[in-house]
Amino acid sequence: MEFRRILVPVVGTEADDEAIRLACRLAKKDKGKIWAVSVITLSRTLPIEAELENEIKKAEAVLEHVETVAEEEDYEVETDLFQSREAGPTIIDEAVEREVDLILMGVTYKTRFGQFSLGTVIPHVLKNAPCRVILYHQIKAD
């Protein structure tokens, strides 16, 4: 399998770090390109062009950290920040626009009502992705 164009959505978890490391290893093999994207989701009560300074600063810090992790792997990552109502459709739109071969996502151990949960973004991406998807699952901390 060749992965020349890899999209890595990030939110700032340890699983993101490992997903970026894995993306770098996969991309190196084929001299591929990696895009790390962060999506700020806006409440429907706010206008889509609303500027949430704190959220933007957090997302920019996450993207800067991702660049550092990639540098540790001796690879370069291009980063982008988006604002939208829902992260899932934005990730899919970017995957289509960039014609990626792979979406690689870090998954943390989350529970909802006492059960393990993937949330809403990951199922949306799995259902609608125009390419392969790899989930990197972070081990549950005890």
Residue ranges and their predicted role:
Residues K28, V96-E97, K127:
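Solvent-exposed polar/charged
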Residues M105-N128, D142:
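Glycine-rich, Arg-bearing micro-motifs that act as flexible, cationic patches
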Residues S38-V39, G106-T108, H137-Q138:
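Short secondary-structure boundary segments
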Residues E51-A61:
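A short acidic, glycine-rich active-site loop
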Residues M1-A50, E71-E73, E78:
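Small/aliphatic-rich secondary-structure junction motif
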Residues C24, I92, P123:
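Active-site phosphate/pyrophosphate- and oxyanion-stabilizing loops and adjacent acidic/basic residues
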Residues C131-D142:
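Short, flexible loop segments at boundaries between secondary-structure elements
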Residues M1, E71-I103, D142:
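Structural beta-alpha unit
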